[in-house]
């Protein structure tokens, strides 16, 4: 049975960059666990803000956290009170100085993580899974996505036997490295159990830096 590699991990170093940007030898395990705890806390605290991704950068004794969100107003709060509260609580979870930066996601409809969370929320509200999936597909294509694939697995519709359902529209070439494919996963906690929601969104093609930096060949095909 064929398995699919993670689309983002597959493109790291080609057209995608890492969400944790730092290098360490001795304290690697400590910093890795610290990153996990910081991400879990931000996701739990700002669950209603539509968090797409959380980037963590480290330099010297400083930690910079970039929160990509569809609703920056919820994160910042009234006169910046919300972001200051979160910053103080994050400061208590690390020995380093914390800098918190909020980045707005312009098109939430073509962000795979936000689309997956939206489908999961609809399933928790007892909306029919086919309706939720088809609506997300149509909305993504309407806002400029080149292709989208949506998959849900679990006790769909409360059936006794779990199953796997998926829809696809447009192009979603998983093995083309230059294809800018965003991937998101979310879980819907229903009375029948958990339902997994996966979303792949093709947003276009990106030429890798290494390829774009090469000098063009002459008309005859000979190297300069």
Curated annotation (Swiss-Prot):
InterPro entries: KH_dom, KH_dom-like_a/b, KH_dom_type_2, KH_sf_prok-type, Ribosomal_S3_C_sf, Ribosomal_uS3_bac-typ, Ribosomal_uS3_C, Ribosomal_uS3_CS. GO terms for biological process: translation. PROSITE patterns: KH_TYPE_2, RIBOSOMAL_S3. Residues 38-106 form the KH type-2 domain. GO terms for molecular function: mRNA binding; rRNA binding; structural constituent of ribosome. Gene3D superfamilies: 3.30.300.20, Ribosomal protein S3, C-terminal domain (3.30.1140.32). Keywords: Ribonucleoprotein, Ribosomal protein, RNA-binding, rRNA-binding. GO terms for cellular component: cytosolic small ribosomal subunit. It comes from the Bacteria. Belongs to the universal ribosomal protein uS3 family. Part of the 30S ribosomal subunit. Forms a tight complex with proteins S10 and S14. Binds the lower part of the 30S subunit head. Binds mRNA in the 70S ribosome, positioning it for translation. This is Small ribosomal subunit protein uS3. The gene is rpsC.
């Amino acid at each position: 049975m064929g398995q699919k590699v993670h689309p983002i991990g597959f493109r790291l170093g080609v057209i995608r960059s890492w969400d944790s940007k730092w290098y360490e030898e001795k304290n690697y395990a400590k910093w890795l666990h610290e990153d996990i705890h910081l991400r879990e806390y931000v996701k739990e605290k700002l669950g209603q803000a539509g968090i797409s991704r959380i980037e963590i950068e480290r330099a010297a004794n400083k930690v910079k956290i970039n929160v990509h969100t569809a609703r920056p107003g919820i994160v910042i709060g009234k006169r910046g009170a919300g972001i200051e509260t979160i910053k103080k609580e994050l400061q208590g979870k690390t020995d380093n100085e914390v800098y918190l930066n909020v980045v707005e996601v312009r098109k939430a409809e073509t962000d795979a993580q936000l689309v997956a969370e939206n489908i999961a929320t609809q399933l928790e509200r007892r909306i029919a899974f086919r309706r939720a999936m088809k609506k997300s597909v149509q909305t993504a294509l309407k806002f400029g996505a080149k292709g989208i694939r949506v998959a849900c697995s679990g006790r769909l519709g409360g059936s006794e036997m779990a199953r796997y359902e998926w829809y696809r529209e447009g192009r979603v070439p998983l093995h083309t490295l230059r294809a800018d494919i965003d991937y998101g996963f979310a879980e819907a906690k229903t009375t029948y159990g958990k339902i997994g929601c996966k979303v792949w969104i093709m947003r276009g093609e990106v030429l890798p830096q290494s390829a774009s930096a090469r000098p063009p060949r002459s008309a005859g095909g000979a190297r300069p």
